[in-house]
């Protein structure tokens, strides 16, 4: 019983020369506040601008779809669903993640808000990823099956994809809360993160990323093959020049009639076909860039998210932040990519702003 008393009196009467040791012990028990260097302030400011730009751009796309009557049909309902998920990322996820970064990745806002933030994070990001997948599937079917993929079928299929997107995202995000599938908040260490339960890690990463990744890669491979096949079939629809004169005799009806063919070019391509091919090429390029940016943004995060709990690999905090915000940035790039390859949005933006003035 004397040992704690002596330690207490020693700690209270510690001379100033031993002050660094006492402060070191205090830091072990309770981490100090993060030092806001100029570089850190700059990074946090840029992240704040990213959140604001993501919200503004997606809200503009969503408002345009709601205001312009011609956009009240497919595939713009898929774009609206994607814009909603990305707006929610900017409103519900990014601000609290920015607070988390500002406090040195320590969560000081309580268990309830931590659970709500993680659920919104998984819900909105998963929905954004599956909305990209739905747009890629819609483009694939419209390019490769444009005869049977009618407007009525397209509308029904797109509505089903939107419903499945949000249903699957809800199940993945609420599974830890509803079924006690791991813990998201640790009060002693002030940690707030997605459940590290290995079974949930496999379930969530496969459902939120690896499955849609396989779908979009398969879709783009099929689009590439379809485009390559169309180029090949277009070449076979023409007759090349004949190097030498060829005599063709019709011996059955007119024995004395001779045709001389020196050059013949037959094409089956109309102006409508050319317009359709140009539209399909733009759509294929848009889907390719959309998929490429999606993979670049989310692949590092989900690789570490899967390997870290399964292999007990402690990823440095700085890399966790980089990979997480790189994934968030996909919500900023999505509307930029889609509207850049759709001329109707450019004219719709002009009409929208002209009416506001």
From Swiss-Prot:
Range of residues in the leader sequence: none
SUPFAM superfamilies assigned to the protein according to its UniProt record, in alphabetical order: Family A G protein-coupled receptor-like (SSF81321)
InterPro entries, per database record: 5HT5A_rcpt (IPR001397), 5HT_rcpt (IPR002231), GPCR_Rhodpsn (IPR000276), GPCR_Rhodpsn_7TM (IPR017452)
Extracellular compartment spans: 1-36, 104-114, 177-198, 313-314
Tissue expression: Expressed predominantly in the central nervous system; in the cerebral cortex, hippocampus, habenula, olfactory bulb and granular layer of the cerebellum.
Disulfide bonds: 114-192
GO CC list: dendrite; perikaryon; plasma membrane; postsynaptic specialization membrane
Keyword Cell membrane on entry: yes
Glycan-carrying positions: 6, 21
Topological category with respect to the lipid bilayer: Multi-pass membrane protein
Keywords: Cell membrane, Disulfide bond, G-protein coupled receptor, Glycoprotein, Membrane, Receptor, Transducer, Transmembrane, Transmembrane helix
Phenotypic consequence of gene deletion: Mice display increased exploratory activity but no change in anxiety-related behaviors. They also show decreased locomotor response to LSD in an open field.
Organism domain of life: Eukaryota
Cellular location(s): Cell membrane
Residue ranges of the TM segments: 37-63, 77-103, 115-137, 156-176, 199-220, 288-312, 315-339
GO molecular function: G protein-coupled serotonin receptor activity; Gi/o-coupled serotonin receptor activity; serotonin receptor activity
BP term (GO), one: G protein-coupled receptor signaling pathway, coupled to cyclic nucleotide second messenger
Binding site for serotonin: 121
Main location: membrane
Cytoplasmic side: 64-76, 138-155, 221-287, 340-357
Name used for this protein in its record: 5-hydroxytryptamine receptor 5A
Lineage of origin: Eukaryota, Metazoa, Chordata, Craniata, Vertebrata
């Amino acid at each position: 019983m004397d040992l704690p008393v002596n330690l207490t009196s020693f700690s209270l009467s510690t001379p100033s020369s031993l002050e660094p040791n006492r402060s070191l012990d205090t830091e072990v028990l309770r981490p100090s506040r993060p030092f806001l260097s100029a570089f850190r302030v700059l990074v946090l400011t840029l992240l704040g601008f990213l959140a604001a730009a993501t919200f503004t751009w997606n809200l503009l796309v969503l408002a345009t779809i709601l205001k312009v009557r011609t956009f009240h049909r497919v595939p713009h309902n898929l774009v609206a669903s994607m814009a909603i998920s990305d707006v929610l990322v900017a409103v519900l996820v990014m601000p609290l993640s920015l607070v988390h970064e500002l406090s040195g990745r320590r969560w000081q806002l309580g268990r309830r808000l931590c659970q709500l933030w993680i659920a919104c994070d998984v819900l909105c990001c998963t929905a954004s990823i599956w909305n990209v997948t739905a747009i890629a599937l819609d483009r694939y079917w419209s390019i490769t099956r444009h005869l049977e993929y009618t407007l009525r079928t397209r509308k029904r299929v797109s509505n089903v994809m939107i419903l499945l997107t949000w249903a699957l995202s809800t199940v993945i995000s609420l599974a830890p809360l509803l079924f006690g599938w791991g813990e998201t908040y640790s009060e002693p260490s002030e940690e707030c993160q997605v459940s590290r339960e290995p079974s949930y890690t496999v379930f969530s990463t496969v459902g939120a990323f690896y499955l849609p990744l396989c779908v979009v890669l398969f879709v783009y491979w099929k689009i590439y093959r379809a485009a390559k096949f169309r180029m090949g079939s277009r070449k076979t629809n023409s007759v090349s020049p004949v190097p030498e004169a060829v005599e063709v005799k019709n011996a059955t009806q007119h024995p004395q009639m001779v045709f001389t063919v020196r050059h013949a070019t037959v094409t089956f391509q109309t102006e409508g076909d050319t317009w359709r091919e140009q539209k399909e090429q733009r759509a294929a390029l848009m889907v390719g860039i959309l998929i490429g940016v999606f993979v670049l943004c989310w692949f590092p995060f989900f690789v570490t998210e899967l390997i870290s709990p399964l292999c007990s690999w402690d990823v440095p905090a700085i890399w966790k932040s980089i990979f997480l915000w790189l994934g968030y940035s996909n919500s900023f790039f999505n509307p930029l990519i889609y509207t850049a390859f759709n001329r109707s949005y450019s004219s719709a933006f002009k009409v929208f702003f002209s009416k506001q003035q």
